[in-house]
């Protein structure tokens, strides 16, 4: 008896005692729409407006499932109040999520819908996880040997599950291997519910088999079907670029939902799912001649006015099935990733999201999900990942990481309120925070999960005067001079407050993190062949590497001939962004003039400053580790410090410096939630 119980609830083993029972479909993919059968049995169109959610909270990795039942219930309430009607989860969640989803929907007049995703890398893993997921949404799954112990999935949320999305962001190399080097993969498939089209790739054949198996399993065990599709994105979509452009864009595989054909038995139908992000401007000009000819009727009057330069219109026209955007987003982080894309405030983030969501609907897509619901601290961005401890970045908020700022909800430092609000008000400061006093000017210091806060107070502290503040972070390098100033200690940074538009943080050239990591990719010169002196005296701008958006015309390839690879590499090198430039503004969310990117603000005879930890080369501020010497360690390694030093000068001469004690907070992460300005902008367009 126990063995049967285990097999039934844990291993997806079942006996079909109702082989002749009808299979129903409450949700269908019909034409270009998703429909939902109402209480009168009528299929009505359903336009999905939602957010992507993952179980991410500060102090935990996503797979730790740090969010609990109360968190999910609160978030679902916020999402419902925003005007959304759906949630997309890219993978199986924890029992608390499904219990919260069930509880919310059974106690609210307007339930939320769920688009459920699953991830896997091959046929076997996808087949297994899809069966598990199907049992979970029907409340018929117990995982006896999960990483967190036993997991009970007993809440039946299947009435609100719109469909399934197979896969995450597929690795193009995996697709290539399966298409060309995996002899075990069949090159065609004819199933009960799905078949592969003539000319389908082996990877598409694998997906047809997976989708067929999942539909068969739910049809036989639960007597229900629902739409199913697989995830794609601009790097792996069906578009084929001419070789010269494909090389630059690194686009060498294609996945086409049209190559997976539903049978008449698949009553629920299929859909195309895309994660949207900027890929390249004028992409239609880079297509192969054959594809340009095949798509000519679509391309002729393509609407290029939207956010993705015609991509939305192209996909809507091309596909014979509903199209859903499972994720699109814009970061409100302090630092960008690409040329010509400066950082966005929360308001600008909301305006970009609202504009894109509206355009997606106007072009006839069946749904759009904003990615993501909450900021995700454990995410790392390519141009800053090298600079922090890869095992502990969930314990602090890296304002310099764009990927951490995509949410509509922020996690703010402090259990209830921020320790410091950058607004020119001294209410959060007292003598306990005083760290330095010189020539009538006082420096106060505090820190949080986000960065170091300073208040400079005294006569002459105003936008008209220039203040120089040397900061000594590491004992391993630095300089004691700058122009006519002589610092008491070898300093690694120089904070120059020079009005509202020219204030900035400079770094000692030897301690410039981006130089040692990306200089070769920017200039072709290995920085370790041009090592700055140990006690380098030059301060330089703090830069951040950016991706180039330049696409070299195919004609240039022919002109350059055999040398094209190196020449093109030269033209497409990484660019740089002066991330040390500070933004003047009010950083108090309660202010009508709130600027989420604000770094400093002048008050009466004072200025408040926020310096993000990574801007000061902290490797892990939770335990107060800073970067060690790059050229002695051959890269970034952490070294603990118990204090850093700071001083101030208005005029030439010697600059005494005093310590700022540092203790860190370890794993004790205290945060509170805050709905961003972008949330309320989305609420305005979705609540109509």
Regions found by a protein language model. Name each.
Residues 120-124, 132-201, 222-234:
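Active-site groove signature of glycoside hydrolases
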Residues 434-568, 623, 627-651:
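Surface-exposed, glycine/proline- and aromatic-rich loop segments on solvent-exposed faces
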Residues 14-107:
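Active-site-adjacent substrate/metal-binding segments within catalytic domains
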Residues 69-138, 210-226:
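Aromatic-lined substrate-binding rim segments of carbohydrate-active enzymes
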């Amino acid at each position: 008896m126990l063995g049967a119980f285990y097999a039934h609830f844990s291993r997806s083993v079942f006996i079909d005692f109702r082989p002749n029972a009808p299979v129903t479909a409450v949700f269908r993919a019909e034409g270009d729409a998703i429909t939902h059968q109402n209480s009168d049995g009528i299929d009505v169109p359903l336009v999905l407006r939602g957010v992507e959610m993952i179980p991410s909270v500060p102090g935990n990795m996503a797979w730790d499932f740090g969010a609990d039942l109360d968190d999910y219930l609160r978030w679902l309430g916020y999402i419902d109040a925003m005007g959304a009607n759906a949630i997309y989860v890219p993978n199986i969640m924890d029992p608390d999520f499904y219990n919260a989803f069930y509880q919310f929907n059974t106690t609210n007049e307007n339930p939320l819908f769920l688009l459920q995703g699953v991830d896997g890398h091959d046929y076997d893993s996808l087949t297994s996880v899809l069966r598990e997921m199907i049992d979970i949404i029907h409340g018929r799954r117990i995982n006896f040997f999960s990483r967190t112990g036993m997991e009970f999935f007993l809440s039946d949320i299947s009435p609100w599950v719109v469909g399934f999305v197979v896969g995450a962001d597929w690795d193009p190399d995996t697709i290539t291997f399966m298409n060309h080097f995996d002899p075990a993969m069949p090159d065609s498939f004819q199933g009960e519910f799905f078949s592969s089209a003539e000319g389908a790739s082996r990877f598409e054949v694998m997906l047809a088999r997976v989708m067929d198996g999942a539909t068969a399993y739910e049809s036989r065990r639960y007597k229900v079907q629902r739409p199913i599709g697989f995830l794609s994105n601009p790097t792996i979509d069906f578009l084929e670029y001419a070789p010269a452009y494909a090389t630059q864009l690194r686009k060498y595989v294609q996945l086409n939902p049209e190559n997976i054909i539903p049978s008449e038995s698949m009553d629920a139908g299929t859909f195309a799912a895309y994660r949207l992000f900027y890929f390249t401007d004028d992409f239609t000009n880079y297509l192969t001649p054959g594809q340009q000819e095949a798509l000519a009727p679509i391309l002729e009057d393509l609407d290029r006015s939207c956010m993705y330069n015609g991509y939305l219109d192209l996909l809507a026209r091309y596909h014979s099935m509903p199209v859903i955007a499972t994720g699109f987003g814009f970061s409100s982080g302090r630092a960008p990733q690409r040329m010509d894309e400066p950082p966005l405030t929360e308001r600008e983030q909301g305006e970009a999201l609202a504009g894109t969501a509206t355009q997606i609907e106007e072009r006839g897509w069946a749904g759009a999900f904003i990615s993501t619901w909450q900021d995700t601290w454990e995410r790392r961005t390519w141009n800053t990942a090298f600079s922090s401890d890869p095992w502990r970045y969930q314990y602090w908020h890296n304002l310099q990481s764009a990927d951490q700022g995509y949410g509509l909800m922020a996690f703010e430092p402090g259990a209830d309120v921020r320790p410091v609000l950058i607004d020119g008000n001294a209410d959060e400061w007292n003598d306990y925070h005083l760290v330095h006093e010189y020539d009538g000017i006082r420096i106060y210091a505090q820190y949080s999960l986000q960065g170091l806060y300073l208040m400079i107070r005294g006569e002459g502290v105003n936008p008209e005067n220039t203040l120089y503040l040397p900061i000594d972070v590491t004992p391993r390098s630095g300089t004691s001079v700058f122009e006519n100033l002589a610092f008491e200690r070898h300093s690694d940074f120089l904070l120059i407050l020079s009005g509202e538009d020219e204030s900035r943080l400079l770094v000692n050239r030897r301690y410039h993190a981006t130089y040692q990591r990306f200089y070769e990719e920017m200039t072709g010169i290995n920085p370790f062949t041009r090592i700055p002196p140990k006690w380098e005296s030059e301060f330089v701008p703090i830069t951040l590497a950016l991706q180039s958006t330049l696409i070299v015309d195919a004609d240039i390839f022919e002109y350059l001939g055999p040398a094209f690879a190196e020449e093109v590499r030269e033209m497409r090198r990484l660019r740089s962004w002066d991330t040390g430039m500070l933004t003047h503004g009010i950083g108090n969310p309660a202010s009508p003039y709130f600027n989420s990117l604000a770094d400093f603000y002048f008050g009466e005879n004072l200025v408040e400053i926020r310096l993000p930890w990574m801007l000061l080369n902290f490797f892990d501020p939770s335990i107060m580790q800073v970067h060690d010497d790059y050229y002695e360690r051959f890269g970034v390694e952490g070294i603990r410090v118990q204090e850093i030093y700071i001083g101030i000068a208005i005029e030439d001469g010697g600059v005494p410096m005093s310590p700022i004690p540092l203790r860190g907070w370890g794993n004790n992460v205290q945060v509170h939630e805050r709905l961003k300005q972008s949330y309320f902008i989305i609420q305005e367009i979705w609540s109509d």
